[in-house]
């Protein structure tokens, strides 16, 4: 009981009814626990993939080249993205408060933006990290069993998928817990604007990761074809052609890390946009506890639905 009182005092606005707070906390903590279980599942699937045979020395050498190239590209991309994120973070901190018009975005929106950027980048990196290691193990498994190769490849995709949805759900529920249950005071007007920062952060990373990775992929593909096949007469995808490695690096950073960030942005955007629609559907005639219950129920509906989706997956 004492712990519950501390949690209520920490996360709930003073104007919110106790019953509404209990429901809000329960649904958020439940969704957070489900998201954590999804991340644990992704980590376990990754460990199962890493336990598979990685093939002979030549296979591992080629795979290592792709892994190092993908890691180097993401490191360079994220380094420049960090500058962009820092600039936008500062602008959100100092440039969006307007007390005269009842707008209080500032540091809360900036924190949500930073969390969205971090979650999106993490999901993309972890998915790419798994994919570059699963590819060689899928090839080795295909030497003995088609079903074994499918199992490794499918598990690799599962890691990316579960990481994306779980990271998105973790970020949103943490923000909801951090900012507390909405009530009828002025915070209710700006509440969803705070959380919009999370979607903005996810979209920012997705934009650069998807487009940047795609450009790199196409440049390596065209360059490898022109120089390798046309000029040197080396067959396509031959490991003797350095552009083949670059092409495979591009496939991973664009179609895995970039696509993962893109899917993360779409997933988070769908949840938050549904919550915004829910805010607009609250009947205007409701007051007091009835208004807060309707507000909280419609806000939490997309979050709980997403949590059910994680369980179903």
What is the meaning of each model-derived region?
Residues 3-313:
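Hydrophobic packing and interface segments
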């Amino acid at each position: 009981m004492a712990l519950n009182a501390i949690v209520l005092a920490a996360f709930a606005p003073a104007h919110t009814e106790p019953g509404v707070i209990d429901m809000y906390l329960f649904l958020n903590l439940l969704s957070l626990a489900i998201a954590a279980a999804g991340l644990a599942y992704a980590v376990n699937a990754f460990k199962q993939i890493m336990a598979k045979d990685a093939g002979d020395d030549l296979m591992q050498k080629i795979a290592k080249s792709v892994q190092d190239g993908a890691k180097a590209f993401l490191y360079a991309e994220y380094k420049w993205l960090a500058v962009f994120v820092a600039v936008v973070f500062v602008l959100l901190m100092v440039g969006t408060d307007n007390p005269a018009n009842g707008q209080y975005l500032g540091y809360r929106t900036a924190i949500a933006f930073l969390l969205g950027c971090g979650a999106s980048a993490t999901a993309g990196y972890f998915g790419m990290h798994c994919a570059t290691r699963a590819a060689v193990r899928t090839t080795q498994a295909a030497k003995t069993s088609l079903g074994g190769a499918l199992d490794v490849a499918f598990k690799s995709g599962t890691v990316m998928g579960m990481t994306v949805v779980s990271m998105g759900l973790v970020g949103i529920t943490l923000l909801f817990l951090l900012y507390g249950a909405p009530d009828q005071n002025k915070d209710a007007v700006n509440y969803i604007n705070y959380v919009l920062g999370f979607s903005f952060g996810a979209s920012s990373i997705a934009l650069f990761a998807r487009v940047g990775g795609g450009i790199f992929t196409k440049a390596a593909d065209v360059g490898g074809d022109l120089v390798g096949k046309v000029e040197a007469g080396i067959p396509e995808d031959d490991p003797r052609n350095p552009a083949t490695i670059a092409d495979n690096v591009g496939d991973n950073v664009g179609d895995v890390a970039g696509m993962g960030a893109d899917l993360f942005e779409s997933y988070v955007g769908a949840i938050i946009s549904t919550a915004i629609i829910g805010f607009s559907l609250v009947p205007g005639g409701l007051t007091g506890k009835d208004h807060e219950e309707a507000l909280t129920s419609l806000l939490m509906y997309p979050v709980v639905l997403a949590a059910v989706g994680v369980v179903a997956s």
